[in-house]
Amino acid sequence: MKKKTNNKGTANLRQTQGPQTRNIILAILTGGLLTAAWPIWGIAPFIFIAFVPLLLLEGFVAEGERGRMFWLSFLAFFVWNVATTWWVWNATPAATLAWLLNALFMATVFWLFHLTKKKVCNNPWGNFILIPYWMAFELLTYHWAIKWPWLNLGHVFSSQVSWVQWYEYTGVAGGTLWVLIVNILIANILQFFKTKKAKPILINIGLEAIILLLPIIISTRVYKHYEDQGTDTEVIVVQQNCDPWNEQFDNHFYDQVIQNNINLSLPLVTPNTRFIVSSESAIQEGIWLHETEKAKALKTLHDYVSRFSQLSFVIGGTTYEWVPKGMEDDFPARHIDGTDKYYYCHNSALLISGDGLQHRNKSQLTPVVEAIPEWMGFLRNFSLTVGIARGTLKGDPESKVMTFDGHKVAVPICYESAFGEYVGSFCAKGADLIFVITNDGWWGDTPGYKQHFEFSKLRAIENRRCIARSANTGRSGFFNQRGDVLQQTKYWEPDAIKATLKANKEVTFYAKNGDYLSRIAVYVTFVLLITWIAKSFLDLGKNRKATKTTTRKKR
């Protein structure tokens, strides 16, 4: 006897599998397009369609399938995070926690957008709710415990600086806003085609053309006519090329590193040279801030610059200081075994001149590697050594400029150059030049050091400042005020280069006001969340009332 085949069940299974496959493909497509748009692949136009598959997917997922939307968006963002920042593994496997957490945070943002849209404005116009949610999230990436602004959408245009000269007014948040609006309008056009309503289709097409093209047209015109402002200042950049894994932190190489800096820069020094800029963490002998006169490296460099009139040396190093009494419970404080003493460790930038020593400590510390959140304090018991970092460093509470020969200079250290508002705060305090010092050799010959180099282009535009960038083994160079690369070195080659940069004292709108667009987005997000919660409670009350009415009628 033949068993009956459940044709209806088989058909339902096929119907379910079809949409599931489609949704997974759309999620992966968004991750792939975001990756293809990102520096250093540099196909920036892909960013304008990257969110479209995910927005279409969101329209397919019903309100009752909330969990499915979360995991599909997580898939999209996990693909993007891993494919774009896989090189983090080269520095420390622990830092790959950023892949997982950042994808989870992004998925949570998209999931909240999905829930709010379904409840507040469940049609294509509701897609605009994503904008304040995403921009508020990007603001958080600069400020919460695990800071990771590397993938903030506005950074994508570092490969197309002629398109975003207006960053001097908006910062990268303006780029994020631009990207999201264009993606949403394209998604809306496709979704309105299903309704066959001509008016909304034409409105979206018109808006799309204006919003996509007008910023490019205006920016290209500004780019064509902009000229660097300020006074001429001669700067030398040194790429010492000391292997951070095998040499730089070995005490047998301490003196050689300093001598390499002198030997590389000396042939380029002229009476007009004002600054020599070298890399992050180049001095490793251990400088105690209360007795800097005992540091051999500082004395050697002081003697070097004193041979010339009006010459200074900017370089990175590890510094230490005692923890003040009563501050022993401060999380970054480190205990000296067998004593009652505690000390702080800093990743510092030092300016050495005939007038003495100035320093600032890195504030925006690299998550896990340099800064362990207190809730992850258990990691302090493990050796997470990457260069100078083991456990948590102590940073300055705010930016600090250093002065020399009438100049105020900003010296962002490594990761800090990814923080637009923070770099702008130096310029708001009068910095007329920016010197980025970094040690990108941890990542090897990967997209990591190349992406990091690209971000300096955007910092130059945001602040209209020339930038000198020294990378130990990555890529060093000079940038003008419109984000062009004036000179650059080759990877893993010792070198020194020289340029005359314009020191500009004019403060841009963005440097004065910071990420104001993202702060506005936070307020809008708050209103939308309150509206969603209130409407959810109202609908819940209506449903309960309707259920009771139905029950009474049945009785």
Placement of each model-derived feature along the sequence:
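Membrane-embedded alpha-helical bundles of multi-pass enzymes
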Residues: K2-Y226, D445, S456, A471, ...
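Short, conserved active-site loops that position catalytic residues or coordinate cofactors/metal ions
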Residues: W38-L55, W80-V82, Q239-Q240, N272-L289, ...
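Active-site catalytic loop in hydrolytic enzyme cores
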Residues: V88-A91, L140-V172, K299, R334-G420, ...
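CN hydrolase (nitrilase-like) catalytic-core segments centered on the catalytic cysteine
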Residues: P132, F275, S281-I283, E291-I315, ...
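Non-cytosolic juxtamembrane linkers/loops
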Residues: I211-T270, N439-H452, K457-R464, A468-R469, ...
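Soluble catalytic regions of membrane-associated enzymes that act on cell-envelope
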Residues: T220-P367, V401-D405, V411, Y415
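Cysteine/selenocysteine-centered motifs that mediate thiol-based redox chemistry or coordinate metal-sulfur cofactors
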Residues: S383-I413, N504-K545
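Cytoplasmic C-terminal tails of single-pass
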Residues: R544-R555
